């Protein structure tokens, strides 16, 4: 029986979908809960959400997205592993509910803790937290990993065929 892995992420640009595709290529029963894929049921729900945000200062869509995650997990059943990318967009309360659907609950941080705080998620929520930020790995004891790139390898182009005159690579940190 193949391992069951669920990926939960916002995935604005369909970048994380490629992770699930690669897992499936390896024979893993993988599925993606795309939080950004949540849609209002109708225009009345959209108007009610806008009213709540403007008048009450509360955004019901945030809670509905989290309920959507639980609905999808209820439908798909218990998973061998669940990986959440950018866990700060989900409340602790919902993380603890999600965790009941798996034996191994992990998080991957797309950014440093200084830019996207996860302090509220450090105690008893995740079995493992992965980060590419060396300072965060050292300070919080996260597991070090790299960023990933879903692009297929391309053959090296002959220098004679290169038309660009410049290449610029930058990083704002100390690397």
Task: Annotate each predicted stretch with a short phrase.
Residues 95-175:
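Catalytic core of nucleotide-activated saccharide and alditol-phosphate transferases
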């Amino acid at each position: 029986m193949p391992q069951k892995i669920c990926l939960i992420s916002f995935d604005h640009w369909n970048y994380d979908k490629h992770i699930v595709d690669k897992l499936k290529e390896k024979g893993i029963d993988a599925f993606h809960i795309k939080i950004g894929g949540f849609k209002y049921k109708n225009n009345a729900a959209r108007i009610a959400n806008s009213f709540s945000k403007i008048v009450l200062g509360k955004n019901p869509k945030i809670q509905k997205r989290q309920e959507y995650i639980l609905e999808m997990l209820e439908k798909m059943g218990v998973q061998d592993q669940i990986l959440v990318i950018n866990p700060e967009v989900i409340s602790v309360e919902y993380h603890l509910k999600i965790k009941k659907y798996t034996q191994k609950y992990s998080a991957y941080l797309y950014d440093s803790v200084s830019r996207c705080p996860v302090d509220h998620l450090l105690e008893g929520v995740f079995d493992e937290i992965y980060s590419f930020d060396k300072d965060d790995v050292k300070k919080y004891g996260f597991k070090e990993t790299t960023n990933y790139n879903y692009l297929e390898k391309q053959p090296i182009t002959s220098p004679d065929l290169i038309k660009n005159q410049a290449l610029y690579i930058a990083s704002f940190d100390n690397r």
